Amino acid sequence: MRVGITLACTECKRRNYISTKNKKNDPDRIELKKYCSFCGRHTVHKETK
């Protein structure tokens, strides 16, 4: 079952990306390194509700 998730920047706390994940394969919260247009650089983005 795929569910929608939001990815938030860990530095500025803004929610920049919307994605989906498979809860069966990834039960934990996802952390990805993505570009934050507000910070102007690549930062770690964590899954939020």
Curated annotation (Swiss-Prot):
User: What GO cellular component term, any one, is given?
Assistant: cytoplasm
Q: Please report a single Pfam family linked to this protein.
A: Ribosomal_L33
* Family matches, as PROSITE patterns: RIBOSOMAL_L33 (PS00582)
Which domain of life, per UniProt?
Answer: Bacteria
Instruction: Enumerate the InterPro entries for this protein.
Output: Ribosomal_bL33, Ribosomal_bL33_CS, Ribosomal_bL33_sf, Ribosomal_zn-bd
Molecular-function GO terms, alphabetical: structural constituent of ribosome
Sorted alphabetically, the keyword list is: Ribonucleoprotein, Ribosomal protein
Which GO annotations describe the biological process of this protein?
Answer: translation
Q: Which NCBIfam families match?
A: PRK00504.1, PRK00595.1, rpmG_bact
Similarity field? Belongs to the bacterial ribosomal protein bL33 family.
Protein name, per record: Large ribosomal subunit protein bL33
Q: What is the lineage of its organism?
A: Bacteria, Bacillati, Bacillota, Clostridia, Moorellales
- Gene that this sequence comes from: rpmG
